Amino acid sequence: SRRQRQMCIRDSYRRLRNTLRYLLGALSDFDKKEIIDYSDMPEIEKWVLNEVYKLSKKIIEYTQNYQLGDIYREVYDFCNDDLSSFYFDIRKDTLYCSSYDSVERRSCRTVLNILFTCICTWLEPILCFTTEEAWKTQNIDENESVHLKEYYKANDLWDNDTLSKKWEIIRNLRLKVTNKIEEKRREG
């Protein structure tokens, strides 16, 4: 029904907006000096960048074919499944408990900065005002609009099928364990 579609659209928009809000909060005092080289990053950050690499290729193809609905769906799935339900959940302790100059925290924030740029530029043709507001909030000193930015150029070093397969196994195991824990909680 029409009402269900509206609720679905509202919920998906809220998820994307909340992802941007989370990134803005986690990057509030980010300094470019924190950026850490890919080769020094922990494996989970390399996995996220591999996912960014794969998604970036799809987004470019969808853009060339004017498939905005596919862009929205792919970015939504990435934010919901890969980021909110997995990466953000795992890395929240690193963000808030690790020392400010630790490799893990700096790696995480480097990746979050890349994610912010990617998500804003990928969604800017679709969520014009939301991405512009987020962009201006993060880039206070910059006068250029997100609408004048190009997509973030994913590094070919990030392409790693072996890592992708390994983390798919880890994610599936984590999901099974989480489901069992939830089942036991419900049972009391």
What do the predicted segments below correspond to?
Residues 30-57, 88-180, 184-187:
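Acidic, turn-prone loop/beta-hairpin segments
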Residues 66, 78, 82, 126-129, ...:
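Residue-level signal for short amphipathic helical patches enriched in basic/charged
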Residues 63-70:
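Short helix-adjacent coil turns
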Residues 13, 20, 72, 76, ...:
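Short runs of predominantly hydrophobic/aromatic residues within well-ordered alpha helices
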Residues 1-9:
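Single conserved hydrophobic/aromatic residue that forms the stacking wall/gate
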Residues 12-24, 43-55, 73-95:
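Core structural elements
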